[in-house]
UniProtKB/Swiss-Prot annotation:
The keyword rRNA-binding does not apply. Keywords: DNA damage, DNA repair. SMART domains: DNA_mis_repair (SM01340), MutL_C (SM00853). This is DNA mismatch repair protein MutL. GO terms for cellular component: mismatch repair complex. Belongs to the DNA mismatch repair MutL/HexB family. Pfam families: DNA_mis_repair, HATPase_c_3, MutL_C. GO terms for biological process: mismatch repair. GO terms for molecular function: ATP binding; ATP hydrolysis activity; ATP-dependent DNA damage sensor activity; mismatched DNA binding. This protein is involved in the repair of mismatches in DNA. It is required for dam-dependent methyl-directed DNA mismatch repair. May act as a 'molecular matchmaker', a protein that promotes the formation of a stable complex between two or more DNA-binding proteins in an ATP-dependent manner without itself being part of a final effector complex. NCBIfam families: mutl. PANTHER family: DNA MISMATCH REPAIR PROTEIN MLH, PMS, MUTL, DNA MISMATCH REPAIR PROTEIN MLH1.
Length: 594
C-alpha cells in the first residue's frame, strides 16, 4: 500500500482513540472547555449513560459565529499560539483536537453565542471530508455541545462500552473530581431526565466543606485535617485524613494548578509521608491542591493530560512529604500519651554502654541572629531528600574490651510488632515484650550525652518554620551556647518570633510548633553557663517531654532499635524498664484443664 494522506474523518477517528475512550472522556473534554471559557454554571444532561445523548451547556464567553467552523477543525484553538505558550500553559485544554475527535465518532452539534452577538450560531460536521455547516439558532450567551449516538460509526468501539450503570458511574466520579477542582462553579447532572447531582457554588470555607461532604461523604470531612502551606513558590493546601476510613469509596484527589491529575511522584510523596508517620501501609484519604508557576510544570506529556512533569521534581516531592508529615505529626501528637518512658534519668547510670565515636567532623559555628532569612541553596535542596526520607539515625559505636558482645539473633528471634510500639521476641520457651519507646529514649539519651563537645548535628529544614517563642530575642542570645549545642539554627523575625532554619535529628520529625517552645521552657530552668552536669540533667529531662519520642514504629525501625539494644546495653535481658517476659502460666493452666 503506498504512503498517502489520510482523509480527515479517518485522521480524526484515529485521534479520537486517544481522546475519546468512553462517554466520561467526552464530558471531561467538554466541561474543561466550559471552564476555560469562564463559565460559572455548567449543566450536563445524559441519556443511557451518555451512550445515546450527552449535552453540556454553559454560560461562558461563547464562540463567535465566524469561528464555529474552526472550532470543529483539528488543531484549532484560542488557548496557545506560539511555542512559548506551551512553556506556561494555564488552561485545561490546549491541543485543539477534542471537538474534532468527538465529532468524528458521533453526531455532534455546537451552538454558541457571545455577548457581542445578537443571535447565536449552530455548527455541525458531517461527511467524509467533515465539512462544517453553520446556521443561525436561538441560544443565550454561552455554549451548548450536543453529542448523539457515540461511536455510531465505529461498531468495534461501541461494543467495548459497558452497561449504562457502569458508564454513568464513571461520569459521576468525573464530575465529582471536577466539582472539587472549582468550588466557584455550579455543576448540575441530569440522567434520563432526573436531576441527580447539584453542586452549588461554594465561596466561603464552610460552603467549600459542604461541597466536600457532598462529594466525598461526611466521614471524610469529620476526620480530615485542613492544611495550607507555601514555600519557595510552592503552595499546597486541602484536606487529608490521618486515619483509614471505613467508607468503600476511595477519596484520593490531587490537583495541580486546578488540573485533576494522577501523578506517580505526588502519590509516592503522599504515601511516604503517611508511612513515616504511621509505620503502616494503608489507603490514605486526601484532597490536595498544589499550585506553582506554570513554567515549572509540563502538562503536555500525556494524551489525556492525567500526568504532569515537574521541572524540580525532587523539591516538589520533598515539599509535599514535609507538609503532610508535619500535619500528621501534629494530629498524632494530640492523641499521644503525655508521659514518655519514666525513670530514664534515675536509671541512666545503670546502663553501661559502649563508648561512642564522635559523629561530627568539626565544630558547628553559631551565627548571630539576623532580621531575615534566605532560601536554601541548590546543594541544600539536593540534600533534603536524604534528610526527609531517612530514619532517625542510630548511634555509631566503637567496641572496647569489656563491652557487651552482640548475641546471635537466631537465638533470640523477633516475632512481630504489636500496636506499632512493642516488639515481641522469643528465646527458648519464653516470650518477651520490649518497649520501643523506652529503647528509643535510651538510645537518644546515650547519643546526646556523648555529644557534649561537638553538639547535636543541625539538619536544615526544607521549609523554614516561623514560631512564637514568648521570649525576647535577648533571652535567646543569652542561651546561644546552649542552642548551638542543641543543633538549633534560627533567624530572628518579629518580637518574640523566630524563623527555624535547622534542627537536630531528634526534632526533625516532631511537631516543632510545640516541641521547640517546650524545649525553651525547660531550658529556662537551667543556668546560662553550660557544664557537663547541667547538659546531662537537661537531656534526661528533655527526653521525657511529650511528643519528642515517636510512639509509632515500622518493623524496620523496630529491628534497628532491637539490634542497637543488644549491641550497646549491658545485661539488657534483665532490664525490666526496657523489656519484660510474658507470663504464660495462667494460659497454659487453662489449656491443661481443658
Amino acid at each position: 500500500m503506498p504512503i498517502q494522506i489520510l482523509p480527515p474523518i479517518l485522521a480524526n477517528q484515529i485521534a479520537a482513540g486517544e481522546v475519546v475512550e468512553r462517554p466520561a472522556s467526552v464530558i471531561k473534554e467538554l466541561v474543561e472547555n466550559s471552564l476555560d471559557a469562564g463559565a460559572n454554571r455548567i449543566d450536563v444532561e445524559l441519556e443511557k449513560g451518555g451512550c445515546q445523548l450527552i449535552r453540556v451547556r454553559d454560560n461562558g464567553g461563547g464562540i463567535c459565529g465566524t469561528e464555529l467552523a474552526l472550532a470543529l477543525a483539528r488543531h484549532a484553538t484560542s488557548k496557545v499560539a506560539t511555542l512559548d505558550d506551551l512553556e506556561h500553559i494555564a488552561s485545561l485544554g490546549f491541543r485543539g483536537e477534542a471537538l474534532a475527535s468527538i465529532s468524528s465518532v458521533s453526531r455532534l452539534t455546537l451552538t454558541s453565542r457571545t455577548a457581542g452577538q445578537h443571535e447565536a450560531w449552530q455548527a455541525y460536521a458531517e461527511g467524509r471530508e467533515m465539512a462544517v455547516t453553520v446556521k443561525p439558532a436561538a441560544h443565550p450567551v454561552g455554549t451548548t455541545v450536543e453529542v448523539l449516538d457515540l461511536f455510531f460509526n465505529t461498531p468495534a468501539r461501541r461494543r467495548f462500552l459497558r452497561s449504562e450503570k457502569t458508564e454513568f458511574a464513571h461520569i459521576d466520579e468525573l464530575l465529582r473530581r471536577l466539582a472539587l477542582s472549582r468550588f466557584d462553579v455550579a455543576i448540575n447532572l441530569k440522567h434520563n431526565g432526573k436531576l441527580l447531582r447539584q453542586y452549588r457554588p461554594a465561596q466561603t470555607e464552610s460552603q467549600q466543606e459542604q461541597r466536600v461532604v457532598q462529594a466525598c461523604g461526611a466521614e471524610f470531612m469529620q476526620a480530615a485535617l485542613r492544611i495550607d502551606s507555601e514555600h519557595l513558590g510552592l503552595h499546597l493546601y486541602g484536606w487529608l485524613a490521618p486515619q483509614p476510613l471505613t467508607a468503600i469509596n476511595e477519596v484520593q484527589y490531587c490537583y495541580v494548578n486546578g488540573r485533576m491529575i494522577r501523578d506517580k511522584l505526588l502519590n509516592h510523596a503522599i504515601r511516604q509521608a503517611y508511612s513515616e508517620c504511621t509505620g503502616t501501609s494503608f489507603q490514605p484519604a486526601y484532597i490536595l491542591y498544589l499550585e506553582l508557576d506554570p513554567h515549572q510544570v509540563d502538562v503536555n506529556v500525556h494524551p489525556s493530560k492525567h500526568e504532569v512533569r515537574f521541572h524540580e521534581s525532587r523539591q516538589v516531592h520533598d515539599f509535599i512529604v514535609q507538609v503532610i508529615r508535619q500535619a500528621l505529626q501534629t494530629a498524632y501528637s494530640e492523641n499521644a500519651p503525655d508521659a514518655v518512658f519514666s525513670g530514664i534519668e534515675d536509671a541512666a547510670p545503670d546502663y553501661p554502654v559502649s563508648p561512642l565515636k564522635n559523629r561530627a567532623t568539626g565544630q558547628h559555628q553559631y551565627s548571630a541572629p539576623t532580621g531575615g532569612y534566605s532560601s536554601p541553596s541548590g546543594s541544600q535542596l539536593r540534600s533534603y531528600g536524604q534528610l526527609l526520607t531517612s530514619e532517625l539515625p542510630s548511634i555509631p559505636v566503637s567496641r572496647e574490651a569489656g563491652s557487651v558482645a552482640a548475641p546471635d539473633n537466631s537465638d533470640w528471634p523477633v516475632l512481630r510488632l504489636i500496636q506499632q510500639r512493642y516488639l515481641l521476641s522469643a528465646q527458648d520457651d519464653t516470650l518477651y515484650l520490649s518497649d520501643l519507646v523506652a529503647i528509643q529514649s535510651l538510645q537518644w539519651l546515650t547519643q546526646c550525652n556523648a555529644s557534649f563537645n561537638e553538639g547535636l548535628i543541625a539538619q536544615p529544614l526544607l521549609i523554614p518554620q516561623r514560631l512564637d517563642i514568648a521570649r525576647p530575642h535577648e533571652w535567646l542570645a543569652e542561651y546561644g551556647i546552649w542552642l548551638q549545642k542543641l543543633g538549633l539554627r534560627y533567624n530572628t523575625h518579629k518580637n518574640k518570633q523566630i524563623i527555624i532554619q535547622a534542627v537536630p535529628a531528634l526534632l526533625r520529625q516532631t511537631d516543632m510548633a510545640s516541641t521547640i517552645p517546650a524545649m525553651l521552657s525547660l531550658l529556662e530552668r537551667y543556668p546560662v553557663a553550660l557544664s557537663h552536669q547541667e547538659w546531662h540533667s537537661f537531656i534526661a529531662t528533655w527526653l521525657k517531654l511529650p511528643g519528642l519520642i515517636p510512639h509509632h514504629y515500622s518493623m524496620d525501625s523496630a529491628r534497628s532499635l532491637w539490634l542497637w539494644l543488644q549491641q550497646n546495653v549491658a545485661d539488657w535481658q534483665n532490664n525490666t524498664q526496657l523489656m519484660r517476659s510474658v507470663d504464660l502460666t495462667n494460659i497454659l493452666e487453662v489449656f491443661s484443664r481443658d
